[in-house]
Amino acid sequence: MAVQKYTVALFLAMALVAGPAASYAADAGTPPTPATPAVPGAAAGKATTHEQKLIEDINAAFKWWPASAPPADKYKTFETAFSKANIAGASTKGLDAAYSVVYNTAAGATPEAKYDSFVTALTEALRIMAGTLEVHAVKPATEEEVPSAKILRANSRSSTRSSRFKIAATVATPLSHSTAANSAPANDKFTVFEGAFNKAIKERHGGPTETYKFIPSLEAAVKQAYGATVARAPEVKYAVFEAGLTKAITAMSEAQKVAKPVRLSPQPPQVLPLAAGGAATVAAASDSRGGYKV
C-alpha cells in the first residue's frame, strides 16, 4: 500500500508542471494510508501549499522505504519501488536513466551514505519543479498572493544542505516576483520570471555560482519545465515535463560532483614553547573548505 501511495505521489509531483493544481490536489489523498511502520510526517507548519505538502510526503517516502533494508540494498529498494513503476502506461525510461546517473555520482563513503546523497539530489530536483509551478501559476489578479516573509523563512529552514544544495530557498526567492510576472504581457511572463530566478541564484550564491557546471543545466531545466505549462496536448505536456525533470535531476548530479567534501587527515597537536618556560598545546586549525555533509 505504501508503495502504491508514494509511487502515485511521485507522478503527481510530475503533474505539478504538466497539469493544473486543482486536478491533483484532490487526488493526493485518495491512495490508501500505509500500514505501520508509519511514514514520518512533515514538520508542523513547514508545508504551506498543496505542492509543498506533496513534496514533503515524497521526501518522507524516500527516507522511509529503504530504512529497513540492508545498506547495500537501499538503492535497489528505491529502484524497485519507483523506477519499475508504470502508472497509466507512462514511459519512465528517461527518468530511470537520470536516477542511475545521480546515484552513480552520489558522494558517500558507505552505501547508506551514498543513498542519502542520492535522496538529497532527487528531493531538491523535485522541489525545483514544485517551485517552478508556483512561480508560473497564472491566477486572476484578485487571487494573486504574495508569499509572506514567514513562508519564505520556512522554505529557507527546510533546506539544510550546503549553499550549492539550497535550491529550494533559491527558487522560493523569485516567488515574490510572481506578481510582477503575472502583470506582464503574456509573451513576457517567463522572461520576467527568468530574470528574477537568475538574479536570485547570483545573490544567494555569489560570483562563484557562474562557474558551477550545474547552473546552465538547471536554468535549462526551468525553461523546459515552463514549456510544459503552456503545451496543450496532454501527451506533449508529459513528454516535455519528463525531459525537464530529467535535466533537473541530472543537474543535481553535476552539483554533487562540484560539492564533494574535501576530507583532510587529522593533524597532530602542535606544542609551542612559552616565554616563561613550559609548553602550550594548540589544536591545529580546521579547514573550512569541506563540502556538504551527507
Swiss-Prot record:
Keywords: Allergen, Signal. InterPro entries: Poa_pIX/Phl_pVI (IPR002914), Pollen_allergen/Os (IPR035506). It comes from the Eukaryota. Transmembrane segments: none annotated. Pfam families: Pollen_allerg_2. The keyword Signal applies. Belongs to the Poa p IX/Phl p VI allergen family. This is Major pollen allergen Pha a 5.3.
